[in-house]
């Protein structure tokens, strides 16, 4: 998986009529407990278990899922890998409805510099207690409506480094974040 050109993640917006699958797979969003963005694939992952999630369908971004059983329930850890930073074109509803998601690592592998819409990006991530969004570039974002809507287990959230100079819509951005005790906007 050696690519020198830009690696753009496919659009993955949830359906409005019901539960959606993850990035073109048959796995439901509600079955994901962890998302890890990374640069390399472990050796134990074979080609048959990976699928292409790049917008160009050029295998510049690959994903695979590892089965985990929690309380006898089949769930998955999702891994997304690329040799370069993964560029987002649009983040609207990107993680919407991942209701069992407990951990997501956005870290250094995401390039959101050209994203203008982050509305409902983490909407309905009920199980997520903490989230590090310090790596998100929000300098071109105009819409943050409902970005953290219904993230009911967040206790603290630091968005102090968000560049909101172009944002025109923040409606319901933190609605139903019922456990939120500390919100850093400074």
Each language-model region and where it sits:
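Negatively charged
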Residues: 1-186
């Amino acid at each position: 998986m050696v690519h020198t050109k830009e690696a753009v993640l496919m659009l993955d917006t949830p359906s409005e009529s019901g539960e959606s699958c993850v990035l073109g797979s048959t796995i439901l969003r509600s079955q994901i407990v962890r998302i890890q963005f990374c640069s390399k694939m472990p050796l134990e992952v074979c080609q048959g278990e990976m699928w292409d999630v790049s917008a160009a369908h050029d295998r510049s971004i690959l994903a695979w899922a590892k089965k985990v059983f929690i309380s006898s329930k089949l769930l998955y850890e999702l891994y997304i890998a690329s040799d370069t930073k993964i560029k987002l074109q649009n983040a609207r509803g990107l993680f919407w409805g991942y209701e069992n998601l407990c951990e997501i690592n956005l870290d250094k592998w995401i390039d959101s510099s050209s994203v203008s819409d982050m509305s409902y990006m983490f909407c309905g991530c009920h199980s997520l207690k903490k989230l590090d969004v310090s790596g998100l570039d929000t300098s071109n974002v105009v819409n943050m409506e409902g970005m953290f809507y219904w993230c009911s287990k967040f206790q603290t959230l630091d968005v102090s480094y968000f560049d909101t100079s172009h944002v025109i819509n923040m409606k319901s951005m933190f609605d139903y974040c019922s456990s939120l005790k500390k919100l850093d906007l400074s």
